[in-house]
Each structure stands twice: as structure tokens, then as C-alpha cells.
Amino acid sequence: MDGMAPVAASGDFAADVAAFSNYWRHTTERLARLPARPNRDAATYDLAESLKQAAREARFVFLRRHARTLYDRLTDNRTKFVRIERLVYEAAALVPGLVPTQAQVAAEAELRQSEKDGVEIDQGILCNQFLADPECGLHLCHAMLLPREESSDALAKFQRDGSLDLGCARVERQGKAAVLLLSNRRFLNSEDNATQAATEIGADVCILDRQSEVAVLRGDVVPEGKYAGRRVYNAGINLTHLYYGKIPFLWFLIRDMGFVNKMFRGLARPDVAPDEVAGDSIEKLWISAVETFAIGGGCQILLASDFNIAGRDAYMTLPARKEGIIPAMANLRLQRFVGDRLARQAIMYERRIECDSEVGRMICDEVVAPEEIDATITR
């Protein structure tokens, strides 16, 4: 059994944990004896890839039989909510080898993307199987739609002071609006690991704030470089950090199941399902104010906003094929706005869409002179 993957799960959770974990431990030890990925010759590269692939296939075998049992053990039979970034590491403790530990992920985070063995792929397999189960998947979505633990204190501070500085995001009042400012100014307000928590907490505060009637998402003023003195809406994912391996896999799930989904569906309540038919949620109209450009994931956010205001000089792009990433649900949402063919051109062939154009106005509800953005928000 040490060198061979179990061909099937027995159905006994404890027995299968023991058998599969033993196999994954053995595989990890064999991989550790090989040179680091950049130093492998063709033979050792092929061996490493075959070991990883066999281990991943074994994870699917285990999870197809035990995903719900595992999820129920991690959530006390779905009586408690566990956010996805905790869930995967608690699963690593309960079923050794199924997914990487925090130490293993941290070790790979020190490498460039091209140098990694891809231990986080195993987190993807786990999340895939949890989300594929309707009951587990909906429960996990519910957990990610709840306000973050930090948001209660942040809301109190915002209501006391009228402003909130979260570092890479800020919340301000502008008339009847709570304005969430993306403030990763060094990187043109792109999104990365440093911005994620601040942005989601800021969104929670905007939605929960009873003194405001709408929430506005806007980019902060860039202090230097080509766009110095101008507001930039969102440059998408921080490609510099992506290249250097600083964007973890979980970042994508946390962003899209948290911040973006909260804009789209509102905040969940712990005692009521957040579905659109029989459930309930705390919602607020979201307005995006597009200045200069909305690139990649920034453009994707526009598709989840309720109303988009854009400057006449602004543009949108969604170069997902070039980046190797489909931002959130953009491949499904964009075609609802502009049709299938134009969506393909944007995603696959980097078509640039001017906000002040026939196609741009299919996404942007109101296009105004750049100096009129503030007045349009407060109108």
C-alpha cells in the first residue's frame, strides 16, 4: 500500500483516512527526495509529475466518497460556519495529506510561480468537491456571505468618525453614499493579497451602514507615474505579485465568494439562507465609478455592480486569456451585457472597450465628463 494509490474508497471514513493518508505521506516523501522543480531533468520532471497526478487522482477518489462526511465533521454537521481559508487547513489536520498544511503553502509562497510544484492545486480539488455537493456548497457560500469578524468593530469606528482607513482600502461618506475606495496606489489600485481583507471589510461596512442609502466603489488617486494625480478604478490582479508567486490560490475563491458575491447578493444572516426565493439578505445598491480604466478583475466587478458611472475617457479590458485567468464569473456575465461574440473578443483577444462607445454603454449606465463624476455620485 505504501507505494500504490488506493484504487477505491472502502466507505469507512476512518479506515480510508488511514489508507489514503499513508499513501499521500509516501508520495510526499518521494517528491522531497527529488531535486527542486527548476533543477529537474526530463526524467525526474516526468517522475514528479506522475507522482503528483496519481496523488491528485487519489484525492478525487477519496472525496467523491467522503466529501460530505468530511465537511460535516469540519462544520459540526453544518451547524457552524467556517470560512474557506480556515476550512482547508482544518481539513489538512483532519485528513493528513489530503491538502497542504499552512507550512507547506508558506514554503511554496517563497517561490516564483514557475518554480512551484503546485501544492495549492490540492486545495482546489477539495473546494471543487465541497462546492459540487449542493448542501455543502450552499452552506459554504452562506459562510462566505456573512460579515467578517473584523467588520463589527470597523463599522462602529466608521459610524463614530465618518471615515475608515483600512490601509489598502478606505471608506468615506459622500452625501447619501458610503464610498469604498480601493487604495493600492503603488500598483494602480490593483488587487492582491494585501488588499483582500481590507476590501471585503470595507464592503461589509458599506452594506451595514444605516446612514447611507447606496454604496459606491471607486479607485483612489494615484500619486506618481503615468497616471499621477488621476483616479484609477481598478487595474485587476496585481500581475507583478502573480508572477512572483505571491497570489495564493485561495485568494481567488475568497475574493469571488466574499467581496464580489457580497456586492452581487448582499450580506447573509446566520439564521436564514441567503437565497433569492425563500431566504433573506442585507442588500444595498452598489454603484461603480469608473475613472481611467477597469482592467481584468476590475472590469469583472462592473458586471456585478447595480449601476455603473464612467468618465468619457475611461476604458475597459478583460484580457483573461493573456493572464491565464477568467476573472470570477466574467465569462458568463459579460455575454449577458454585450453578447457572446463580443464577450469572446474581450476575453480571448483583448478587445479594448471604450466606456463612451456603443458597446461600452451596454455595460456603463451613465457616461459623463470626468470632472462630473463626483456630482453624478451625489446626485
Locate the predicted segments by residue.
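Crotonase-fold acyl-CoA enzyme core
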Residues: 274-379
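Conserved CoA-thioester-binding segment of acyl-CoA-metabolizing enzymes
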Residues: 122-221, 227
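N-terminal, non-catalytic alpha-helical interaction modules of very large eukaryotic scaffold proteins
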Residues: 2-37, 51-52, 59, 66
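N-terminal intrinsically disordered, low-complexity regulatory domains
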Residues: 43-89
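C-terminal long alpha-helix characteristic of the crotonase
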Residues: 21-44, 48-51, 311-314, 364-379
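Glycine-rich beta-to-alpha active-site loop
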Residues: 52, 56, 86-114, 260-323
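A structural preference for short, pocket-lining loop segments at secondary-structure junctions
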Residues: 180-182, 198-282, 286-287, 311-315
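Eukaryotic intrinsically disordered, low-complexity, charge-rich
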Residues: 79-151
